[in-house]
Amino acid sequence: ACGGGGGGDSAPGVQPGPPPPGQPIPPEPIPPVPSANPYVEAQVLNAFITAATLNDINQPVIEFQLSDGNNIAITDLTLDDVRFVVSKLESSPLGNLTGTWQSYINVIAPPGVGPGTVPELQGTSERDGTFTNLGGGKYSYRYSTSLTDLPADILQQAKAQGLDLSCDPNLTHRVAIQF
């Protein structure tokens, strides 16, 4: 026996059960309105390079999409928010599991920068190509660097250091985006 007294769902600390059948269904929650500044506010960025090609003058052209941690498209990315890199994987005489990444985009670091006492080629990034917002969190970027027409001073410095900056389409290449 329960001891009487009814109690039901009116006793202190007792939560009511589900509504009886046939009651109205509560409305769906209203999703939050996407932010006007999703890039600045995103705590997680999901970036996917969806295409990478060379145009007729051997400039890399990439397409990519960007979303936040909730898979909401980042629609306000600007060229000031990103930098781009392109490099090739050069083989090594030590075997097929070794090699070095050689950047096509370089500057010459003068003596005294870092531990060096002579000018040194230093890989860098660019952002002076053509950046296009395609809408819906999709973007494209055409590098200003042509892989087959690098600046003469960079090629001369590379030669002095024993580096090969020639474009070999048979090698593995990598494009990267820095946010």
Roles of regions detected by a PLM:
Residues D56-F179:
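Extended surface/linker regions that mediate inter-domain or inter-protein docking
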Residues P26-P32, Q43-V44, L66-D68, Q122-T124:
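Short amphipathic alpha-helical surface micro-motifs
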Residues A1-N37:
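Bacterial Sec-dependent N-terminal signal peptides
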Residues A36-N55:
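Low-complexity, acidic Ser/Thr/Pro/Gly-rich terminal tails and inter-domain linkers that flank the onset
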